[in-house]
């Protein structure tokens, strides 16, 4: 697997790598990866999202302080396409407001859908295997965050203050 020594920084993905990666994933992981990318969220922040975290009308996702590294709640806008993918996923699984959007569905557990959040380790392992499968080295769950923030800064010309706000960074050191 890539990055076995866990040193260095996660790779920043090209648009082609991102599209190739998303095309290899089953629905749950594809929607999860889209949310990770467009929110520039950390894997734990996204794995612990509940249905009530999404304001479909305003197009906002609330990342609760309990799951953030900085212990501060933040709101992040989501594109309509991602909101529709989330709506479809939630509806197809019949999830309620207090259910986890991305949940464990192991055959070895007795949890009902939405009852227990998917583990960050499960997502990390699945994503690393997929990156290896498509030949992308040095990538991990954190690559979505780095890729999005890099894109917003270099392509969309966001200021560092805006980058810090969406990412939940308190400083850039």
Role assignments for model-derived ranges:
Residues 2, 11-43:
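Basic, Lys/Arg- and aromatic-enriched nucleic-acid-binding interface segment
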Residues 68-88, 99-128:
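C-terminal catalytic core of Y-nucleophile DNA break-rejoin enzymes
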Residues 25-26, 35-48, 155-159, 167-169:
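A short, glycine-centered helix-capping/turn motif at helix boundaries
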Residues 18, 29-30, 120, 124, ...:
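Short, leucine-enriched amphipathic alpha-helices that occur as contiguous helical runs
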Residues 53-56, 157-173:
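Short, polar N-cap/turn motifs at the start of nucleic acid-interacting alpha helices
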């Amino acid at each position: 697997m890539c990055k076995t020594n866990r040193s260095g920084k996660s790779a920043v993905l090209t648009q082609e790598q991102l599209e190739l990666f998303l095309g290899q994933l089953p629905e749950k992981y594809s929607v999860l990866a889209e949310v990770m990318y467009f929110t520039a969220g950390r894997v734990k922040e996204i794995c612990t999202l509940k249905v009530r975290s999404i304001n479909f009308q305003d197009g906002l996702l609330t990342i609760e302080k309990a799951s953030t590294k900085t212990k501060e709640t933040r709101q992040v806008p989501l594109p309509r396409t991602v909101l529709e993918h989330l709506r479809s996923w939630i509806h197809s699984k019949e999830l309620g407001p207090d259910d986890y959007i991305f949940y464990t569905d192991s055959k070895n557990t007795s949890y009902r859908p939405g009852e227990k959040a998917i583990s960050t380790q499960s997502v990390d392992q699945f994503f690393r295997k997929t990156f290896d499968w498509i030949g992308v080295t040095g990538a991990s769950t954190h690559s979505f965050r780095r890729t999005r923030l890099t894109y917003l800064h270099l392509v969309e010309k966001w200021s560092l203050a805006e980058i810090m706000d969406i990412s939940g960074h308190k400083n850039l050191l």
